[in-house]
Amino acid sequence: VLSDVSSWLVWILPLISSLFVPVIARFSEKARNYFAVIISLVTAVLAFSLLPELFFGAEEALGSSTAWISSEITAGVFIDPLSVLFTVLVAFFGLIIAIYSLGYMKGEEGLTRYYFLLLLFIGSMIGLVISDNFLQMFVFWEMVGLCSYALISFWYKRPESIRAGAKVFLMTRLGDVSLLGAIGLLYASLGSFSFRYAIDNIATIPVPTLTAIAFLTLGGAIAKSAQLPLHTWLYSAMEAPTSVSALLHAATMVKAGIYLIARLILILGPLAFSLPMWLPTVAWIGVLTAFMGATLALYTPDIKGVLAYSTISQLGFMMAALGAVSLNSSLGWFASLFHMMSHAFFEGLGFLLAGGIIHALGTRDMRLMGGLKKAMPITFGLSLIMILTTSGLPPFAAFFSKGLIITSLTEAGNIWQVVLIYATTALTFAYGLRFMKLTFMGDESEHLKELHPHEAPKIMLYPAAILAVLCVAWGFVGPWLVNFMQVEAEVSLLGAFFSLETPIFFAILVPAGLIIYLTYYKHSGVMMKFRSSANPLMTVLKHGYFFDDVYERITGRGIITLSEGVRRANETVMDNVGKPARGILSFASRVRNLESSYSGNLPQKMANLIIAVARAAQKYLDVLADNLLSIIAHRTMRGASRMKNVPSSSLQHYIAAALLGFILILLLIILTVGI
């Protein structure tokens, strides 16, 4: 009973509570801030209360549902290890960021809007991962995207923030359309949105249709989890407050695509391996994204940019592992989720520490840093833990989770994927060393000497310290997590140290470390020449492999072509809309001229009548062209009058759904302007 109540309250509570943030803010801003923290705390408690029942042996998914839009379309919760793992992650990080925000966002304008969106996001993200059907999941999928857009554009007075928000919104919408297509095909094939029904009846769908569903779903995951080729939005999203970057763009929202593919693999079951090229495509997208993200992290001078590209790369690791699932082994599926949690801890830690550094220095450019080790020793120590974990060194969490990913890809047998993933681990170590050198080591820059930097407030350091502890502790949870996730895979702590992949892993770190040492510590002439702008490779990295350049050219030309087409169509419509009336008018005039030559008043009156009708028609058509909105309004009124015939029970559902959507949109508009 407790888990049933908790599974509903864990997402409904933050959603409803978000509506009270503006009300409380009218009385006390401090109460508003702590209200958000308290709700986040209660949400986290509710999330953790879901663990015991699964841990103590529930073999089948739990949950319940209720009628929503109609008796056939329900809203419900689906409690299994996958949904609970994500729910706990989102709720825990929501609490961490709510506490961190008390310090980081102190004194900012628009905090009512910030905390409203924060709670709305937490509720929406949990709703996404705990839904028991595709339609409900998609509604929350869209709400998460809307919150992301609003939070990225939080500093809306900055043009770059508005542009970044719009870019993220538009690029992720491509994935949303793809996912919606998959859901539509699934519903057309099964007649149900339910996960349970899909699991029981998925085999009835023809393989070509199922393949289309799988690839369309992958399209949604690619956009949401910043995979090639729709990855460029994540770097632009760094215009958001760093607390937002930590929650949405490191720990939770960007993992929605990973959740989606992991869920689809569970639904497909053995059929996943019969779909032509689907799993290999998932693996290749992940491997290439991981490699490309690591190379860009090694180039950018932006401290948040390094973390953004690192996130893209680590998401690639997770996607690659999901693609390495085989009929005989689910190790890749487990490794992906194990690393998903590891990444949340070390990348979330990185963003929290970057927020403290930016808070103290007022810049994101690492070239203006250096020498922070003395001024910010606690931040330095925590950053060292973050980098060692990111690099996958023992005994930190990513050593175990990343090792399992490498093992799963090795077992899958594609040698080129294995080579690229090893190369990516070397690049990860390299950009980690570069991060530490540019930020903390060496002499203070002139910029720092003028600022006299200091440690971040304790309210910002405590959440970071908790994540640092988890960076160490999480790796030892692997054997327990295997049982919790109900996966048949061998995970051994000692086995991680003595696996065949471990010596290779350590061997490739040596040249990576040597290159960074020669470049940034010894300033080797050869390496400095390699890094010069004259090197074509540096030009490629500077432009991010030219993805944005291509997109801007395509969309720019597309918009120009579309605009020109609309203009011509409009001119054609406006020129032709009165032609029927003018034709009638001309015909009537000729009739009148003819009748004057032949006979009396009756024909003349008929001609005059036709002329009057023609003039009225011409006037009406001109008004129609100029006042399309009035026509739309008229149609809407007619539609509303027809709703009288709709059964009252259905009408109540439609009105309730429409009213809820209207209230949410209205609140977002009001809060975006500022309260």
Name each model-derived stretch.
Residues 453-512, 543:
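Hard-cation-handling environments
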Residues 1-8, 19-116, 189-204, 232, ...:
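Transmembrane helix-loop-helix hairpins at membrane boundaries of multipass inner-membrane proteins
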Residues 10-26, 222, 226, 290:
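N-terminal signal-anchor/start-transfer transmembrane helix
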Residues 388-404, 468-486, 555, 561, ...:
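Alpha-helical transmembrane segments and their membrane-interface junctions
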Residues 76-91, 207-221, 420-424, 497-514:
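Hydrophobic alpha-helical transmembrane segments
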Residues 60-71, 196-201, 404-408, 480-498:
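Membrane-interfacial helical/loop segments at transmembrane boundaries in membrane proteins
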Residues 481-500, 522-675:
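Aromatic-capped, Gly/Pro-kinked transmembrane alpha-helices
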Residues 96-137, 146-459, 476:
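Hydrophobic transmembrane alpha-helices and their helix-loop junctions in integral membrane proteins
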